[in-house]
Structure formats: structure tokens, C-alpha cells
UniProtKB/Swiss-Prot annotation:
InterPro entries: Ribosomal_bS18 (IPR001648), Ribosomal_bS18_sf (IPR036870). This is Small ribosomal subunit protein bS18. Binds as a heterodimer with protein bS6 to the central domain of the 16S rRNA, where it helps stabilize the platform of the 30S subunit. Part of the 30S ribosomal subunit. Forms a tight heterodimer with protein bS6. The keyword Ribonucleoprotein applies. The gene is rpsR. The keyword Ribonucleoprotein applies. Gene3D superfamilies: Ribosomal protein S18. It comes from the Bacteria. Pfam families: Ribosomal_S18. NCBIfam families: S18 (TIGR00165).
Length: 86
């Protein structure tokens, strides 16, 4: 019988840091919850609580509207060409 994988328990980093409010201008904090293509990561991947996930989503949407972070990214900026330099 196959062994079960051991997963580390995910925890909310915002609760651990005791953050009261997530500001839309703090891009270093928001990039933790964004994928490489600047999509909002779900709770099951980041481990954030429901309360903070709602605040993060609202802050990211405000930052996008204010043009602080982009809505989308070009593919050439995300994935480099593996054949470049050969």
C-alpha cells in the first residue's frame, strides 16, 4: 500500500504578523498572494484566512484600478525562451 504524503499545515501569514489592514499601496505584501501572471491566488494555496483573503482581493482590485500593479502580463515577460542563446 502506498504511503500517504505528509503535508505541512498552512497558516495565515497575516494573522501571524497581526496585520489589521491590508493597504493597496503595499505591493510587496500583495505580491505574496499573486501568481506569476498576476492572478489572485486562492485561499487553499496561500493558506490565508477568509477575513484576510477578502481584504487582499479588495486591495488587489484597488491597486489594479489605480495602475499600481498590472491586470495581466505578456507571456514573453513571464517565461523566457529556452532556446535563447543557443
Amino acid at each position: 500500500m502506498a504511503e500517504k504524503r505528509k503535508y505541512s499545515r498552512k497558516y495565515c501569514k497575516f494573522t501571524e504578523a497581526k496585520i489589521d489592514f491590508i493597504d493597496y499601496k503595499d505591493t510587496s505584501l500583495l505580491k505574496y498572494c499573486l501568481s506569476e501572471r498576476f492572478k489572485i491566488m486562492p485561499r487553499r494555496l496561500t493558506g490565508t484566512s477568509k477575513r484576510y483573503q477578502e481584504m487582499v482581493e479588495k486591495a488587489i482590485k484597488r491597486a489594479r484600478h489605480a495602475a499600481i500593479i498590472p491586470y495581466i502580463v505578456d507571456r514573453k515577460n513571464v517565461v523566457s525562451n529556452p532556446f535563447e542563446g543557443l
